[in-house]
């Protein structure tokens, strides 16, 4: 393939994966061994078109050392303009969560849910009922009281997240199958409801 491409043609590369946890210099060197073309990183780290009920705004890690090794780095956006401003700010700087929260007027309560919106690669510990309740207590601040254009973008994701937490709480409390089924069928698709009830 490398022999058939005009050497002046710029190659866009996402790393070793379509959504890469990191893009190390070693992987870039392997690509440069195959192609002499200019390379632009097309980074899907913040993209959410493959997981439309989620978004990620955590630190842009595992690829910052590449800026001088390639022609450019493009960030694949979410399509949510205010969210994308955060992603661009994250990729262009080392701002702390606190700085991001202040810059974009995000309520401090978001700190409790941020781990679930940080990265597609973050493994989080299981929650017990106390932990679920602690996160559910942020619902009113983030879904009812907070008013901004950013909140309007995040509202569907936050509501879905809290809905999933309510489901987890019901499962952990061993609610009867009838009660769980009645609750599920009004909130989740039929195939998912049947899968949850089967398990």
Language model features with spans:
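Catalytic-core regions of glycoside hydrolase
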Residues: 1-97
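C-terminal functional modules
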Residues: 96-199
